[in-house]
Amino acid sequence: MNRKITDKLATGMFGLCAAIIAAILVGLFSYIIINGVSQLSFQFITTKSSAIAAGGGIRDQLFNSFYILFITMLITIPLGVGGGVFMAEYAPNNKVTDFIRTCIEVLSSLPSIVIGMFGLLMFVNLTGWGYTIIGGALALTVFNLPVMVRVTEDAIRSVPKDLKEASLALGVSRWHTVKTVLIPSAIPSIITGAILASGRVFGEAAALLFTAGLTTPRLNFTEWNPFSETSPLNIFRPAETLAVHIWNVNTQGMIPDAEAIANGGSAVLVISVLVFNLAARWLGTMIYKKLTAN
């Protein structure tokens, strides 16, 4: 077969695959938005949910989702980046290191329901905390930490060796080289990994069913003392997230407008993840320019 024809066929096949993937994503996104846009309003977002009466909102669930996301990433990012840097730069090249990498890959592929059961045993029953925000955040940290470690390790290893060798040749210590050369160069990839991990956290439901619970106590958004039982910042209270609320409304909800609430919540969930990802990518670019003086 003529080389030009073969090249055109291959290009066409790749383009077709890309078009199919794009069509699926656009179709799914459009379906969720179209079904939920009629429910979206300021009142819907700022009103607390209702267990029986129609017209409830998603205020508490939306706050819980972002709050658990914040706490989870507050734990995951330092540990994940530190672990990834160690695996890339300090860990010896031996069978123990290879075994650790294998364990990380296995842990990253565990179903979220398994992580939820582990969290139920460890952070709910064993600690005696019950269903709490911190229990859900720790379970999601177990869920996301292997991904963050692997992404950071790959990002550090992708930095050109010439940069590292030039820094070391000037007599700079390994730690200073990591801090001023490797990490700034790997920041875009690390930020991308953090974004992917954040998206998984924000949309997670199975693990949080067993750790953060299906209920949210009456919250007082004027009470910011984290030790108060009614404070939204209290990490030892149960917290139904938006993803869990959507599942709960669809399967166990008794409200007459359950379908509308679920559609509206799904639209908010998708839009929130999209906006968060765009903002995080912009932030990653700004940090990279600042650290590299570009």
From Swiss-Prot:
Transmembrane annotation, as ranges: 14-34, 66-86, 99-121, 126-148, 190-210, 260-280
GO molecular function, one term: phosphate transmembrane transporter activity
Membrane topology according to the record: Multi-pass membrane protein
Family: Belongs to the binding-protein-dependent transport system permease family. CysTW subfamily.
Database matches in SUPFAM superfamilies: MetI-like (SSF161098)
Function: Part of the binding-protein-dependent transport system YqgGHIJK. Probably responsible for the translocation of the substrate across the membrane.
InterPro entries documented for this protein: MetI-like (IPR000515), MetI-like_sf (IPR035906), Phosphate_PstA (IPR005672)
Subcellular location: Cell membrane
Record's GO cellular component terms: plasma membrane
Protein name: Probable ABC transporter permease protein YqgI
An annotated GO BP: phosphate ion transmembrane transport
Key word Kinase present: no
Entry keyword set: Cell membrane, Membrane, Transmembrane, Transmembrane helix, Transport
Domain ABC transmembrane type-1: 62-280
Natural source organism: Bacillus subtilis (strain 168)
